[in-house]
């Protein structure tokens, strides 16, 4: 009965976290609008080999992540949940793999369910797993790779070992087709500490070639197909997207070595109090035959690799969370049989986070905030109340697990529930009107649908326009952003209109129909005075629509 109740509670939490709130949240630019539009264009064109974005070649990532994202729009249409379905699906499958591995490493199914609970309700896992990016899909393949390696190493027969290594290669091959060569490096460095400690070199060298071969076999058809269709793909993808991003001084998203430490600590909420003990247990496991040290290497080695890399984004460390969830579940299992100090500390952390969030909203971000730079407007008192309630829920469950830790520590999983359910409604208007272009697009849909040409100076906004209007011919105004490479091809001529060319371009092209220019204004809200006067203007925060009617 307890087993059924545990699964039922987990299912209810999953629905409340990953299903209920997602349709109502507007898409964020640039990430969600980008991946929504790439999949829409892939489905519309039927070309599942060469990724295109706004009708241009887009070689920042391989293709398998888009295939998974395509499923959402293919099954559920063009809603916001459909766009996020790929991330949710990948997160669920990763959680099932966490259960599978935890069931083998921990004693009994209950700790394995706890591992899934910790994984699905960790802040970073939830935030990224309900957000339309490729990292949850990549994490799925990396989790599958690490589970496959463990399966192979624990097999007692040569056939079983071979099967595990073949699955390892297939997972790495799919990871490679999702985010590139990183998928081949992460499993290698992740297993290295355990292989050294357990002296598993023989099986690694005997069966490792099977993994290499299966990775090649699953990825080779697309590798050859993309090379045939686009001969420059591999040069650009390898040099620009790997060497420059991870190693060179001009890498994108540069950040210091310690960048990921606070991301990890915040991302592990509401389970942060369990981290020190879990890491300690993992280190102690280096001298045993158990899996604790394997999990520790899986968590730490990729974390160090990402920290060394020049380019950094918070989502990159998502593959580290599956092993940490299992380590923490094992640590909790030992705690409940000994003393619950770490559980009380975890409850205290959550109580303080909840109270701190409430204080930040009421004293800093509210219209009456003490800093004089509020995030909420005077007309958004309702949103202030909702935000306060969201963090109040966090504090409530934190207090419950603090004062009744042995009985109610699992309710830490509900700490994020208020944020998950209310964030879409409680988001400040100035955030919505700079990061969620649907706020403007849906208000101006008749004007945009009537436009012969549409331009934007923001790639993320342009992607939102293309996805909402179901047209890929959105032109860039003055800026290229991440479309610089695609715009460099001769057949992309005309997709970029520079600011100094715009008056003449406008005079010529408005003869064919109305023209809409959608701008993402700078933070100071200044509008370029050199822009031609528009026939219609609509502004929502930093989003500005200028429409020019057709003229003979």
Swiss-Prot record:
GO terms for cellular component: plasma membrane. It catalyses: 4-amino-4-deoxy-alpha-L-arabinopyranosyl di-trans,octa-cis-undecaprenyl phosphate + lipid IVA = lipid IIA + di-trans,octa-cis-undecaprenyl phosphate. Pfam families: PMT. One of its GO terms (biological process) is lipid A biosynthetic process. The chain crosses the membrane at residues 4-24, 81-101, 113-133, 176-196, 207-227, 255-275, 289-309, 313-333, 351-371, 384-404, 411-431. It is a multi-pass membrane protein. Its EC number is 2.4.2.43. It is found in: Cell inner membrane. Keywords: Cell inner membrane, Cell membrane, Glycosyltransferase, Lipid A biosynthesis, Lipid biosynthesis, Lipid metabolism, Lipopolysaccharide biosynthesis, Membrane, Transferase, Transmembrane, Transmembrane helix. Belongs to the glycosyltransferase 83 family. This is Undecaprenyl phosphate-alpha-4-amino-4-deoxy-L-arabinose arabinosyl transferase. It comes from Edwardsiella ictaluri (strain 93-146).
